[in-house]
Amino acid sequence: LFAPNLLLDRNQGKCVEGMVESFDMLLATSSRFRMMNLQGEEFVCLKSIILLNSGVYTFLSSTLKSLEEKDHIHRVLDKITDTLIHLMAKAGLTLQQQHRRLAQLLLILSHIRHMSNKGME
């Protein structure tokens, strides 16, 4: 989905300290996406959630304007979540399958956040 022709060799990461661990985390996450047969639209929704959620609590202070901005961001995040559920329903998943898939996708976000934090170290 991100770069279908990109091939990474785990051994290439050995030249940089900590890179092998990042390769392994990236491989585990991308394998999970493949196993779940993640669709392009779902991937876009997940990327949007990550981008919108990354700064909601850290960059906005407690002024009235920032509280309004936080509320707006939360409404957009709710719409993205609704879109994910709609995509799953459109794919023919039962309600139980939709709930399970949504939970699985949202759980992956914590792994992506962890990888991001590791990359920043």
Swiss-Prot record:
| Keywords, comma-separated and alphabetical | Activator, Cell membrane, Cytoplasm, DNA-binding, Golgi apparatus, Lipid-binding, Lipoprotein, Membrane, Metal-binding, Nucleus, Palmitate, Receptor, Steroid-binding, Transcription, Transcription regulation, Ubl conjugation, Zinc, Zinc-finger
Check the record and name the InterPro entries matching this protein.
NHR-like_dom_sf, Nucl_hrmn_rcpt_lig-bd, Nuclear_hormone_rcpt_NR3, Nuclear_hrmn_rcpt
Q: Does the keyword Cell membrane apply?
A: yes
In alphabetical order, the GO MF annotations are:
sequence-specific DNA binding; steroid binding; zinc ion binding
Pfam families found in the cross-reference section: Hormone_recep
Under the heading Gene3D superfamilies, the entry gives:
Retinoid X Receptor
- Record flagged with keyword Chloroplast: no
What would be one Gene Ontology cellular-component term for the protein? nucleus
| Record GO biological process | cellular response to estradiol stimulus; negative regulation of canonical NF-kappaB signal transduction; negative regulation of DNA-binding transcription factor activity; negative regulation of smooth muscle cell apoptotic process; nuclear receptor-mediated steroid hormone signaling pathway; phospholipase C-activating G protein-coupled receptor signaling pathway; positive regulation of cytosolic calcium ion concentration; positive regulation of DNA-binding transcription factor activity
UniProt main location, coarse = nucleus
PTM summary from the entry reads:
Ubiquitinated; regulated by LATS1 via DCAF1 it leads to ESR1 proteasomal degradation. Deubiquitinated by OTUB1. Ubiquitinated by STUB1/CHIP; in the CA1 hippocampal region following loss of endogenous circulating estradiol (17-beta-estradiol/E2). Ubiquitinated by UBR5, leading to its degradation: UBR5 specifically recognizes and binds ligand-bound ESR1 when it is not associated with coactivators (NCOAs). In presence of NCOAs, the UBR5-degron is not accessible, preventing its ubiquitination and degradation.
Kindly list the places in or outside the cell where this protein is found, as annotated in its UniProt entry: Nucleus; Cytoplasm; Golgi apparatus; Cell membrane
Attached lipid, kind S-palmitoyl cysteine, located at 45
What residue stretches are annotated with the NR LBD domain? 1-121
Signal peptide feature range: none
Q: Which SUPFAM superfamilies does this UniProt record tie to the protein?
A: Nuclear receptor ligand-binding domain
The cross-references to PANTHER family, in alphabetical order and at most eight, read: KNIRPS-RELATED PROTEIN-RELATED (PTHR48092)
Report the protein's function: Nuclear hormone receptor. The steroid hormones and their receptors are involved in the regulation of eukaryotic gene expression and affect cellular proliferation and differentiation in target tissues. Ligand-dependent nuclear transactivation involves either direct homodimer binding to a palindromic estrogen response element (ERE) sequence or association with other DNA-binding transcription factors, such as AP-1/c-Jun, c-Fos, ATF-2, Sp1 and Sp3, to mediate ERE-independent signaling.
Task: Tell me the subunit arrangement.
Answer: Binds DNA as a homodimer. Can form a heterodimer with ESR2. Interacts with coactivator NCOA5. Interacts with NCOA7; the interaction is ligand-inducible. Interacts with AKAP13, CUEDC2, HEXIM1, KDM5A, MAP1S, PELP1, SMARD1, and UBE1C. Interacts with MUC1; the interaction is stimulated by 7 beta-estradiol (E2) and enhances ERS1-mediated transcription. Interacts with DNTTIP2, and UIMC1. Interacts with KMT2D/MLL2. Interacts with ATAD2; the interaction is enhanced by estradiol. Interacts with KIF18A and LDB1. Interacts with RLIM (via its C-terminus). Interacts with MACROD1.
The UniProt family comment states:
Belongs to the nuclear hormone receptor family. NR3 subfamily.
**Domains as described in the record:** Composed of three domains: a modulating N-terminal domain, a DNA-binding domain and a C-terminal ligand-binding domain. The modulating domain, also known as A/B or AF-1 domain has a ligand-independent transactivation function. The C-terminus contains a ligand-dependent transactivation domain, also known as E/F or AF-2 domain which overlaps with the ligand binding domain. AF-1 and AF-2 activate transcription independently and synergistically and act in a promoter- and cell-specific manner.
This chain belongs to which protein, by name?
Estrogen receptor
Organism of origin is Macaca mulatta
Task: Specify the taxonomic lineage.
Answer: Eukaryota, Metazoa, Chordata, Craniata, Vertebrata
Question: Gene for this protein?
Answer: ESR1
